[in-house]
């Protein structure tokens, strides 16, 4: 932990997905002295590394910030727990491990909104490929297509970010693929080509049956570099600023707290905020960068009046549970002593079986309505069921079909509650507060029922256990969505990047805070609009892009 040396070229705040990649890339230049600050502990907790260990990391203060939302009007007054990774690797150490880029149109839209073509799909694809290590290119020829020419145009090999296929399959999920195909959702073997429409098994960020986090991929291999320093359990209290003779405001460092001791750290080049979509806006607001009205209400001196904390977007998921017959599900296995023993032994000796599972094994991307111009729904399908996350599985065979709106129009916010850095901010996603989001929720529930009613599923005699077929009208389904919908932990957008003249954008297209020198934000908070899928790998792409700009002096 801190010694007498508190001057560095680059200070990275947050040792999560983006921070780990940035630390790797910036320290690759020997002249750069890089400090990575992480509020959580080292990622030595054993459950981090076992895929099913997310069950013991989410909701655990050892690895989770333990946030909760405010009561949500769109969720009929319910509050949601809001997990965020608090350890090296950040959310990549506790998430669902699904490798998902989103759609090419997401990045074309970012380029349009920012006025900068370096955010388009072509440039984003190059950044994804730069750190990708895809199993389908391990032996040269792609085992699925028989060649690697077209696949290698879209994917990389030899990078740090390992992508593997899942290590087990389930008959009931294979049948769901067929049922979706009967509905017109085509099968796909690659959700990451730029058009993720289709149905198939997710690829995952694992290596040989272990979770492959950003810490393992990007940080551990380079921690011995003499120009890279990593401090854990280091809480950033505020950013520090000074005004030059020309009147320009510069961020010259940070004040951190470590075990009750305040330490000032100086950044000779840049401070890079990579604390995530909740903590990055909180740190900015506490430091005087944010909406003037909010800051003044807490007695904070305004450095820059800018909409930090606004534009919060998230994916909200509606979960349906179906009882099934005549097939094996995880419920069946875990409700017997023999089954549990088999699961443990299978992982111990083969690194396979249910302990190697991601939370969701199968996915589908499709339209909620034929009039939609592109896929706006993502399905997460599981051979298991439970009442709520963290509870025991049901004692009957069942499957869960969850579906989320990929392009919500509801917008929320993150706002500090006090001037204390240890006080959790107010998190208000404002779920289901637009007519369009409620319409998508209704359509998605009806679509789930149609898929489960296809011939391929009839052999399992599926019975809708939750929410129940008694809910049929638009009004009933809207109210139902408010009762049962839950976040799938993809908050983004709270420190928006955009065109230099956009008053709603906090950052310029190269992620520099407008109105301040020496300060950049690089994490999921910069997204002007949420990507059409899981958000962890897009966050790494953002960091890859930013690292290139920083190293080239842009």
Protein language model features and the residues they cover:
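N-terminal redox-cofactor-binding region of secreted/periplasmic oxidoreductases
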Residues: 1-554
């Amino acid at each position: 932990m801190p010694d007498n040396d508190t001057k560095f070229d680059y200070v990275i705040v947050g040792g999560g997905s983006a921070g780990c990649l940035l630390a790797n890339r910036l320290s690759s230049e020997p002249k750069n002295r890089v400090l990575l600050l992480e509020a959580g502990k080292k990622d030595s907790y054993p459950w981090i590394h076992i895929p099913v260990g997310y069950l013991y990391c989410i909701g655990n203060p050892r690895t989770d910030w333990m946030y909760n939302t405010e009561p949500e009007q769109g969720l009929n007054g319910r509050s949601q727990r809001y997990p965020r990774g608090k350890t090296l690797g950040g959310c990549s150490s506790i998430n669902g491990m699904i490798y998902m880029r989103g759609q090419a149109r997401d990045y074309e839209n970012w380029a349009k909104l920012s006025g900068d073509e370096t955010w388009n799909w072509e440039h984003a694809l190059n950044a994804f490929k730069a750190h990708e290590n895809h199993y389908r290119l391990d032996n040269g020829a792609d085992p699925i297509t028989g060649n690697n020419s077209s696949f290698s145009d879209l994917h990389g090999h030899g990078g740090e970010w390992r992508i593997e296929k899942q290590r087990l399959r389930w008959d009931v999920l294979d049948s769901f693929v067929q049922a979706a195909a009967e509905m017109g959702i085509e099968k796909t073997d690659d959700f990451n080509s730029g058009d993720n429409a289709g149905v198939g098994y997710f690829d995952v960020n694992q290596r040989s049956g272990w979770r492959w986090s950003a810490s393992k991929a990007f940080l551990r291999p380079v921690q011995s570099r003499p120009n890279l320093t990593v401090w854990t359990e280091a809480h950033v209290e505020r950013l520090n600023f000074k005004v030059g003779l020309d009147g320009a405001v510069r961020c010259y460092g940070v004040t951190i707290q470590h075990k009750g001791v305040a330490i000032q750290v100086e950044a000779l080049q840049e401070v890079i905020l990579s604390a995530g979509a909740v903590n990055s806006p909180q740190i900015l607001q506490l430091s005087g960068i944010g909406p003037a009205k909010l800051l003044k209400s807490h007695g904070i001196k305004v450095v820059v009046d800018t909409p930090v904390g606004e534009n919060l977007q998230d994916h909200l998921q509606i979960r349906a549970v179906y009882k099934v017959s005549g097939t094996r599900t995880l419920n069946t296995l875990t409700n017997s002593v023999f089954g549990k023993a088999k699961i443990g032994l299978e992982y111990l000796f083969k690194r396979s079986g249910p302990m190697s599972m991601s939370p969701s094994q199968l996915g589908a991307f499709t339209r909620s309505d034929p009039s939609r111009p592109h896929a706006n729904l993502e399905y997460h399908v599981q051979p298991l069921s439970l009442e709520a996350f963290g509870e025991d599985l049901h004692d009957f065979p069942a499957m869960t079909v969850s579906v989320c709106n990929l392009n919500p129009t509801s917008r929320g916010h993150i706002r500090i509650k006090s001037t204390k850095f240890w006080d959790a901010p107010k998190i208000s996603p404002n779920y289901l507060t637009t007519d369009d989001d409620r319409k998508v929720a209704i359509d998605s529930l009806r679509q789930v029922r149609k898929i489960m009613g296809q011939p391929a599923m009839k052999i399992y005699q599926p019975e809708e256990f939750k929410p129940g077929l008694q809910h049929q009208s638009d009004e009933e389904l809207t109210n139902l969505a408010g009762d049962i919908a839950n976040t799938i932990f993809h908050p983004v957008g709270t420190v928006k990047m955009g065109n230099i003249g956009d008053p709603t954008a906090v950052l310029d297209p190269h992620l520099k805070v407008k109105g301040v020198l020496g300060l950049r934000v690089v994490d999921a908070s910069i997204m002007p609009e949420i990507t059409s899928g899981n958000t962890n790998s897009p966050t790494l792409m953002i960091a890859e892009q930013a690292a290139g700009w920083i190293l080239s002096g842009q």
